[in-house]
């Protein structure tokens, strides 16, 4: 077995942890500690002679300095051919003499108690923060008498540390005991600086506690799992020991981390550069240049600020700030780095710059990508939780999540997965996380766009400090709740012409454009609603900066009552729910609101494009109500309301906005009972008023403006087609709502341009509308996102029902849990429900596409519709011909022949059918014909449901209801509008109409092709295609 080679005077084997130097004479290796050669000084030796060789060859030969320059002849290095090196004594002297802009221009200087998460959220932590005293910061530090000797005592003399040789800007390793000896020596031959002594795992850690704000924001402190197989990054606690004239060149802290410094003894001077896109590009170019140590980066940027941190001061430097540090006197300081969620995008940009510059691992954030994966999972859970609780994340959190998700996509690409795979935790499913996080971000952005509007920058530009009052005032423009929709809602500070109604003792600012600070705990919800209303209902004559002028007495009275009552209200399903014992106050405030009604009556209509927005995440079994064309006076509906945290004990998490955003889900019926209805004659309200006798509307509605006779006839025809016995339609049992189970209706919507469109109604909780305006495409309301399970259940439930492709059938929501209460509500609501719905769907008429036709196939619903139309027309003819005026006209010879043959073949129970070519009917008959034609389409769209009528067991004819699939030819002849007695002037009686039953019965002119039989003519009149579908 070969022996292990030994070296040096001590004749020990090679030790990789000990510095060794080779003798240039005997070629033997010696430990530096054994021959008295320090590692940092070895570079100055040109030829080394070991102690044995020094006897024969003399001492070691040192390197000669070439072209030594006298410092007195050098300015900034520009007067001579050789520039000044960074960190040299001349460089430090020149740096001390230079003038820089003061950092007071950009610094924030709060007290320790004011520096909270909310403080940094409002200002996005985008500028440095200097705290003059440590009181209130929540950190523990040794006393000011603590020295480097004490550091050695708590950490250990043999602790190997990284030291920077300032003059050469090079790294070297030393034992802590050696550095302390150098630090305490009066004669120092060089300048050494310690900036990377992390002591989290030492006894010194028990004496130092990081600031409370750092512990709250730090990713590693809060999100790093204890069971992680990766090594926990320890970058929170550093001890910085520097002697006079120590200098650290410009840099960005690793991983884009933010950093805190507290000077325990001495002083440090920071040179700060803002991380703009241009400055970051210049920094990357400067860092990769070959003459970096000859260029002062502060000369290449527009602004370099100087900030002096004295003993007892604490400085917080935000993400990405480029900074250099000069130590004018011996200094002992503590600091640390931390990642946070306030500026994720900048952290990732700094990390990418590090990678492009090939930074050594020693100066990188350990396991940076692993931390990011844990944070991504946390953000996904946060977004889901906030959305389920109807609370919204702050803007900076959404932007940070988007940047983080984009980084995840880059790290998991096939071509780059190899170099990033080792930092991915095993508990993270990367592809699923990227997909789910992108979905949550999309949902949040949709909510922002529809309910709150697109906000500009995440935070306002104000840098003012909160009031030192114990109840810190909330700088409202800096919270996300201020960014309400520019289209749909005002900012709370703009209501009442810029003056807010605040709690007693609160200061008021009437100057325009100034921010109004309101104490969060004192905000009145009713006041916010009123401010929303006054801002929303602005006169149409002024597009911008218009204010609603109200009498001073109304405002004073309203303000006085609010201040007296101190209302604390919660909006539940559009109803004001006050606390116990405050009903009288609520009523008083409601009476004050009534004073505003006369002034709101002059407000103009709103553009429907601004109003057709709904929340995508309403509560489960409830759909938000839609605003009508005419906005009802009073409190606004579907407006996001900024409400302080309803739970006084709720702790707002970082990244959550201070205000809850709430929507109003008041139904149309509730709004009609609470507020007056305003509309013009000939509009939609005329249809409601004309049908009040059927739907049980309040008689006060019809007294304002009576409907025209034609409109009333149209309504009566519509109701009679939906339910044959029109005489009993006023009762709840025979109304069209009760026939279809109390939840469906048909309506006729008259639009602004005078056109009429059909609306097929659905349940109030399921309405979605498309308002068709003249000359414009339909405006559709965005539907809320349904889960996959809900969609599948609806499709399975409705899959067997007949559906016409020309109509859109809104989905039905499940109500298994509360079907009992809903059924009671339906029965109670049937008697006063209206036949017109502003939320019914009206779809545009599109060209029909060719479909495959099966020969001999018959559609059951079409046959049923034909039977219903024929029976109804027969009953109408019998009723109308009794009182109608008979029109006699001279018959043509051909008509006489038809009349004679028909009378010979007439049977008592035969259905009346007109000749193929009837003469022109009177005007009244034409109106009736058009109405019946249109209603036939709606009958075919809905399955016929039996009720008290001619086809029911209790009907006049005594026959059962027409079942689907039973054809007209086997029951009774068909009836068409043109075959009624009102169109046949020659008809002697309602039952004496002519019926050509065979080709031989009529000896006159041969009928047209396709019109030979009654069924063909009826199909032609009703515009039914041969395959049983409607032709629109």
Swiss-Prot record:
Residues 644-655, 848-857 have a biased composition (Basic and acidic residues). It is an enzyme of class 1 (oxidoreductase). Substrate binds at residues 248, 268. Its main location: nucleus. GO terms for biological process: brain development; chromatin remodeling; embryonic viscerocranium morphogenesis; G1/S transition of mitotic cell cycle; inner ear morphogenesis; negative regulation of rDNA heterochromatin formation; positive regulation of DNA-templated transcription; positive regulation of transcription by RNA polymerase I. Belongs to the JHDM1 histone demethylase family. JHDM1D subfamily. This is Histone lysine demethylase PHF8. It catalyses: N(6),N(6)-dimethyl-L-lysyl(36)-[histone H3] + 2 2-oxoglutarate + 2 O2 = L-lysyl(36)-[histone H3] + 2 formaldehyde + 2 succinate + 2 CO2; N(6),N(6)-dimethyl-L-lysyl(9)-[histone H3] + 2 2-oxoglutarate + 2 O2 = L-lysyl(9)-[histone H3] + 2 formaldehyde + 2 succinate + 2 CO2. Gene3D superfamilies: 1.20.58.1360, Cupin. Residues 199-355 form the JmjC domain. One of its GO terms (cellular component) is nucleolus. Fe cation binds at residues 251, 253, 323. Residues 583-592, 699-710, 724-739, 970-990 have a biased composition (Low complexity). One of its GO terms (molecular function) is histone H3K27me2/H3K27me3 demethylase activity. Residues 455-515, 577-660, 697-857, 875-923, 943-1015 are annotated as: Disordered. It comes from the Eukaryota. Keywords: Activator, Cell cycle, Chromatin regulator, Dioxygenase, Iron, Metal-binding, Nucleus, Oxidoreductase, Transcription, Transcription regulation, Zinc, Zinc-finger. The lineage of its organism: Eukaryota, Metazoa, Chordata, Craniata, Vertebrata. Residues 65-83 are annotated as: Linker. The PHD-type zinc finger mediates the binding to H3K4me3. Binding to H3K4me3 promotes its access to H3K9me2. The linker region is a critical determinant of demethylase specificity. It enables the active site of JmjC to reach the target H3K9me2 when the PHD-type zinc finger binds to H3K4me3. It is found in: Nucleus; Nucleus, Nucleolus. Histone lysine demethylase with selectivity for the di- and monomethyl states that plays a key role cell cycle progression, rDNA transcription and brain development. Demethylates mono- and dimethylated histone H3 'Lys-9' residue (H3K9Me1 and H3K9Me2), dimethylated H3 'Lys-27' (H3K27Me2) and monomethylated histone H4 'Lys-20' residue (H4K20Me1). Acts as a transcription activator as H3K9Me1, H3K9Me2, H3K27Me2 and H4K20Me1 are epigenetic repressive marks. Involved in cell cycle progression by being required to control G1-S transition.
């Amino acid at each position: 077995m070969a022996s292990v080679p030994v070296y040096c005077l001590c004749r020990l084997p090679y030790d990789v942890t000990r510095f060794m130097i080779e003798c240039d004479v005997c070629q033997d290796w010696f430990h530096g500690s054994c021959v008295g050669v320090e590692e940092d000084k070895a570079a100055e030796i040109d030829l080394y002679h070991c102690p044995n060789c020094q006897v024969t060859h003399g001492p070691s030969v040192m390197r000669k300095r070439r072209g030594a320059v006298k410092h007195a002849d050098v300015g900034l290095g520009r007067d001579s051919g050789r520039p000044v090196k960074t960190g040299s004594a001349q460089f430090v002297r020149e740096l001390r003499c230079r003038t820089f802009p003061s950092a007071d221009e950009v610094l924030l200087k709060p007290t320790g108690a004011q520096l909270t998460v909310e403080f940094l959220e409002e200002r996005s932590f985008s500028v440095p923060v200097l705290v003059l005293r440590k009181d209130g910061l929540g950190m523990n530090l040794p006393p000011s008498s603590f020295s480097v000797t004490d550091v050695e005592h708590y950490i250990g003399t043999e602790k190997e540390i990284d030291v920077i040789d300032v003059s050469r800007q090079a790294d070297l390793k030393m034992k802590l005991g050696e550095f302390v000896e150098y630090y305490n020596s009066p004669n120092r031959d060089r300048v050494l600086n310690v900036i990377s002594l992390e002591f989290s795992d030492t006894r010194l850690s028990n004496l130092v506690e990081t600031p409370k704000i750092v512990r709250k924001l730090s990713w590693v402190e809060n999100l790093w799992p204890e069971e992680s197989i990766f090594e926990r990054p320890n970058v929170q606690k550093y001890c910085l020991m520097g002697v006079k004239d120590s200098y650290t060149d410009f840099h960005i802290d690793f991983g884009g981390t933010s950093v805190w410094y507290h000077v325990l003894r001495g002083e440090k001077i920071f040179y700060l550069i803002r991380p703009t896109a241009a400055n970051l590009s210049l920094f990357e170019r400067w860092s990769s240049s070959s003459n970096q140590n000859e260029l002062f980066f502060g000369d290449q940027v527009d602004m370099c600020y100087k900030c002096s941190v004295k003993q007892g001061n604490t400085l917080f430097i935000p993400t990405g700030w480029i900074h250099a540090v000069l130590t004018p006197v011996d200094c002992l300081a503590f600091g640390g780095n931390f990642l946070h969620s306030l500026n994720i995008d900048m952290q990732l940009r700094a990390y990418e710059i590090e990678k492009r510059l090939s930074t050594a691992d020693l100066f990188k954030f350990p396991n940076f990508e692993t931390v990011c994966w844990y944070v991504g999972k946390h953000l996904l859970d946060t977004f889901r939780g906030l959305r389920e609780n109807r609370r919204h994340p702050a803007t900076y959190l959404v932007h940070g999540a988007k940047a983080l998700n984009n980084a995840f996509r880059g790290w998991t690409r096939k071509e780059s997965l190899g170099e990033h795979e080792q930092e991915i935790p095993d508990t993270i499913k990367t592809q699923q996380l990227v997909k789910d996080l992108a979905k949550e971000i999309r949902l949040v952005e949709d909510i922002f766009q529809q309910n709150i509007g697109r906000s500009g920058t995440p935070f306002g530009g104000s840098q003012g400090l909160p009031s030192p009052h114990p109840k810190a005032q909330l700088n409202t423009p800096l919270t996300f709740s201020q960014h309400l929709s520019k289209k749909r809602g005002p900012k709370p500070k703009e209501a009442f012409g810029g003056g807010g109604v605040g709690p007693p003792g609160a200061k008021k600012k009437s100057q325009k454009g100034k921010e109004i600070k309101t104490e969060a705990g004192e905000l009145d919800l009713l006041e916010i609603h009123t401010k929303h209303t006054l801002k929303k209902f602005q006169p149409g004559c002024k597009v911008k900066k218009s204010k609603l002028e109200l009498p001073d007495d109304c405002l004073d009275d309203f303000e006085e009552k609010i201040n007296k009552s101190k209302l604390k209200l919660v909006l539940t399903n559009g109803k004001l729910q006050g606390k116990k014992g405050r009903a009288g106050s609520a009523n008083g405030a409601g009476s004050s609101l009534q004073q505003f009604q006369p002034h709101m009556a002059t407000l103009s209509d709103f553009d429907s494009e601004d109003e057709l927005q709904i929340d995508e995440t309403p509560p489960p079994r409830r759909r938000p109500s839609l605003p009508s064309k005419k906005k009802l006076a009073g409190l606004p509906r579907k407006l996001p309301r900024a409400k302080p945290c309803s739970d006084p004990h709720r702790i707002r998490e970082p990244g959550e906005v201070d205000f809850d955003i709430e929507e109003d889900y008041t139904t149309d019926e509730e709004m009609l009972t609470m507020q007056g209805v305003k509309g013009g004659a000939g509009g939609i309200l005329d249809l409601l008023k004309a049908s009040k006798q059927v739907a049980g509307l309040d008689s006060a509605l019809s007294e304002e403006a009576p409907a025209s006779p034609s409109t009333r006839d149209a309504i009566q025809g519509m109701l009679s087609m939906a339910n044959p016995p029109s005489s009993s339609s006023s009762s709840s049992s025979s109304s069209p709502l009760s026939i279809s189970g109390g939840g469906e209706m048909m309506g006729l919507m008259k639009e602004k341009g005078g056109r009429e469109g059909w609306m097929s109604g659905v349940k109030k909780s399921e309405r979605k509308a498309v308002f068709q305006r003249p000359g414009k495409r339909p405006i559709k309301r965005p539907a809320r996102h349904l889960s996959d399970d809900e969609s599948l259940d609806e499709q399975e439930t409705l899959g067997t029902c007949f559906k016409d492709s020309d109509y859109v059938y809104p989905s039905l929501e499940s109500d298994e849990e509360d079907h009992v209460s809903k059924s009671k509500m339906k029965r109670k609501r049937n008697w006063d429900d209206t036949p017109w719905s502003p939320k019914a769907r009206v779809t545009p008429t599109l060209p029909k596409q060719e479909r495959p036709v099966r020969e001999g196939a018959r559609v059951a619903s079409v046959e049923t519709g034909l039977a219903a139309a024929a029976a109804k027309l027969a009953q109408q003819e019998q009723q109308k011909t009794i009182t109608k005026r008979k029109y006699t006209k001279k018959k043509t010879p051909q008509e006489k022949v038809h009349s004679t043959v028909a009378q010979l073949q007439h049977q008592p129970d035969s259905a009346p059918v007109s000749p193929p070519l009837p003469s022109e009917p009177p005007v009244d008959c034409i109106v009736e014909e058009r109405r019946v034609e249109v209603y036939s389409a709606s009958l075919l769209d809905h399955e016929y449901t039996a009720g008290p009528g001619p086809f029911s067991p209790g009907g006049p004819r005594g026959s059962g209801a027409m079942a689907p699939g039973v054809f007209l030819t086997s029951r009774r002849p068909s009836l068409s509008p043109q075959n009624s007695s009102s169109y046949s002037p020659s008809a002697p009686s309602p039952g004496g109409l002519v019926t050509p039953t065979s080709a031989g019965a009529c000896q006159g002119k041969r009928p047209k092709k396709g019109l030979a039989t009654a069924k063909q003519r009826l199909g032609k009149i009703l515009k039914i295609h041969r395959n049983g579908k409607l032709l629109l």
